[in-house]
């Protein structure tokens, strides 16, 4: 028995509606992959843009740190000083120049009006030739501002001991710098007698090259108003030097840890490895002295400073 015409019409209409729905479903499936590709492309573009922003910020930071420095001010109290004095401490310049013939650096130091200028070593870089004219010129200019005294760093030691540049210390002396190699220098500043101790080498050299003998020999002295101890490597102090009497220790060498991470601090130093304890700033020692570790003014490795502005240290002592 055949269906009536109305029934046939209803069946056709029903099949037509189903076909239309099937058509819509197949269109959605075709559009879904295209939508996903758009999302992937958008995510990729956002990621590339973020990388570009971060890379640009890092590059700007690196370039800034190669041409700028900051003066970091420290306050140290002394029990015996009758009048306050100011010390400028610079270290790890590594032949870098700030302005023609370091004119910007010299002008800034002159404006700070220091009573003493102390050097922490590594004004030169081992392996970069033997032309130290800019460093010697800087020393001569500094000597016109205030007495200049300092120690050698590991780069000067390598030039002296490995390359046999015996004239290096003589060049410093001719430029007006007193270089202390396990020696003491004394200065009278504003009626105060200031004793400067210069310890040579690194902590592992303490008992081998005269540093321990020197420190033992000056320990009984009390005829001074302030004693400052200089050593290039900061770990020298907690390992050995804090067993002796002085009020202020000064060191450099670490370049501020190269990279300084927000809320974490310095990333690396040669002596202490990752996350070093002594890589820039002020620290208390067991002998109640203050240790100031400068971030230094230059670089000697291919790794750039990041978030780590070079430092000129200014210490006011009262």
Outline where the language-model segments fall.
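N-terminal membrane-anchoring alpha-helices
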Residues: 1-81
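Acidic, His/Gly-rich catalytic cores of divalent-metal-dependent hydrolytic chemistry
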Residues: 24-27, 47-70, 285-318
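Beta-strand-turn-beta hairpins that frame and shape the catalytic cleft
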Residues: 74-88, 177, 184-198, 222-228, ...
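Membrane-embedded segments
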Residues: 84-178
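Active-site neighborhood of phospho(di)ester-bond hydrolases with catalytic His/Asp-centered motifs
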Residues: 90-91, 116-122, 147-154, 180-183, ...
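Solvent-exposed loop/turn segments at secondary-structure junctions
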Residues: 93-95, 123-126, 154-158, 185-187, ...
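Binuclear metal-dependent hydrolase catalytic cores centered on His/Asp/Glu-rich metal-binding motifs
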Residues: 163-177, 189-231, 237-239, 302-305
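Conserved beta-sheet core of the metallophosphoesterase superfamily
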Residues: 234-313
